UniProtKB/Swiss-Prot annotation:
One of its GO terms (molecular function) is oxygen binding. Heterotetramer of two alpha chains and two beta chains. It comes from Eulemur fulvus fulvus. SUPFAM superfamilies: Globin-like. The modification Phosphoserine is found at S45. The modification N6-acetyllysine is found at K60, K83, K145. Involved in oxygen transport from the lung to the various peripheral tissues. Pfam families: Globin (PF00042). The modification Phosphothreonine is found at T13. Residues 3-147 form the Globin domain. Red blood cells. This is Hemoglobin subunit beta.
Amino acid sequence: MTLLSAEENAHVTSLWGKVDVEKVGGEALGRLLVVYPWTQRFFESFGDLSSPSAVMGNPKVKAHGKKVLSAFSEGLHHLDNLKGTFAQLSELHCDKLHVDPQNFTLLGNVLVVVLAEHFGNAFSPAVQAAFQKVVAGVANALAHKYH
């Protein structure tokens, strides 16, 4: 459960309504794979990940980034039950894909960087603080099956 104040909730809701999920999702996943190259091992089937430009231009990275951010977006509607919302994804990533749960935190932090880049001054420290709470809550929910 992620508890946001009314003001924090308003920050998240207002900004998220302006997010291009496809663009931001692709960029966030791409940056994760570039900045933390060991995460690429989970995406070997995506083809060319040999350079930053190859990763950022890879259509499979963009498509999966959209899928990831669409799931994140769904979670924003269930902040009071993130563990339930992400239970199946947590189980998949834990039992089948064997993803290091720390990667969820890394992706959340990369998402915050991408949002800051896209929204500039509108992504104020207060907005960032609200999003940091949300991405931490989502990362915790996705890591739930690991405990």
